[in-house]
Regions:
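ATP/Mg2+-dependent ligation/transfer catalytic cores
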Residues: 1-111
Length: 111
């Protein structure tokens, strides 16, 4: 038995990033792991060196497909170093929250 994992990330479109996704079919019991995509088609890389890594950070049931299918929220990383991709806004936000987590925040996050 298989299920579908819909990997979701934000691309490099400016001035406002767009949501991208691609589907991976996994065997029952397999966890969604690190995957990749061609960043030249998402404004995240040049065509000659276009690999970008998708790293899952959160999964939830897929409300659109139902069943055992899931949505996989991802961050993007550079394949050579596994450092956050320049378009990875979640990594930048996490760094700020890690640094100032003991403070009271007076702002909201939107997606």
């Amino acid at each position: 038995v298989t299920y579908r994992a819909e990997y979701i990330w934000t691309d490099g479109t400016e001035p406002t990033a767009e949501v991208r996704s691609k589907t991976r079919v996994l065997a029952d019991g397999d966890e969604p792991g690190i995957w990749g995509f061609d960043g030249s088609s998402t404004n995240q890389a040049e065509g000659s060196d276009s690999d970008v890594v998708l790293k899952p950070v959160y999964t939830c049931p897929d409300p659109l497909r139902g069943g055992n299918d899931i949505m996989v929220m991802c961050e993007t990383f550079l394949p050579e170093t596994m450092e956050p991709h320049p378009t990875n806004m979640r990594a930048k936000t996490r760094a700020i929250l890690d640094k100032y987590g003991d403070q009271d925040f007076w702002f909201g996050l939107e997606q």
